[in-house]
Amino acid sequence: MNELKLSKRLQTVAEYIPNGAVMADIGSDHAYLPCYAVLNHKASGAIAGEITDGPFLSAKRQVEKSGLNSHISVRQGDGLEVIKKGEADAITIAGMGGALIAHILEAGKDKLTGKERLILQPNIHAVHIREWLYKERYALIDEVILEEDGKCYEVLVAEAGDRDAAYDGISLSAGMLVGPFLAKEKNAVFLKKWTQELQHTQSIYEQISQAADTEQNKQKLKELADRMELLKEVIDHG
């Protein structure tokens, strides 16, 4: 039954699960990721957490269909409240906005020992996750950016460690926004994403610069100019 196929983004998340780990997948939807990880002997066991009835029942059905009831515990609850402290070696949260993932981590941080590996896949606004990890003194140990079905996704991997190590050679503000590992690698997906973002920011800047000359607009123009400068630096240098 290990023919379960994952999307490219979830496959990337799965690759970072430590071998033999007990994983907790928060917002597990159909529990594809924990089922795949256990079936392929990546994880020794898993917890699949879901808050709403539909996805919770879908996850239960998938675990049963995969014959994994003895290896995967499907639990209903909000965020990290589905796990006990120290119960999981790796925590995966995938397919949500960065602000929501950061909120889930903040709301459930009493469940974290600091020894877990966090594997986080935001659909947008990864900056919120990097800021949370830095605040809570987690070390970012790797990042991936990939494109699937015309959309860009990032995967962030963090563990306890030196929170500043990843940001060596890049300003903290730039690293938080675009990702320190991704900025060093600068692959085609990264350049496409941030070139488009720069063009979008320039377009907004031009629109506001033609609007009324208010203090609010002046402040906004300064923020946009700073952002454009930062993006140009990231795209053109290094």
UniProtKB/Swiss-Prot annotation:
Locations listed in the record: Cytoplasm
Principal place of residence: cytoplasm
Catalytic activity as recorded in UniProt: adenosine(22) in tRNA + S-adenosyl-L-methionine = N(1)-methyladenosine(22) in tRNA + S-adenosyl-L-homocysteine + H(+)
Molecular function in Gene Ontology: tRNA (adenine(22)-N1)-methyltransferase activity
UniProt entry tagged with the keyword Methyltransferase: yes
EC number(s) per entry: 2.1.1.217
Keyword terms: Cytoplasm, Methyltransferase, Phosphoprotein, S-adenosyl-L-methionine, Transferase, tRNA processing
Phosphoserine carried by residues: S70
GO cellular component: cytoplasm
Record GO biological process: methylation; tRNA processing
Protein purpose: Catalyzes the S-adenosyl-L-methionine-dependent formation of N(1)-methyladenine at position 22 (m1A22) in tRNA.
PANTHER family, alphabetized: TRNA (ADENINE(22)-N(1))-METHYLTRANSFERASE
Family: Belongs to the TrmK family.
Name of this chain's protein: tRNA (adenine(22)-N(1))-methyltransferase
Species classification: Bacteria, Bacillati, Bacillota, Bacilli, Bacillales
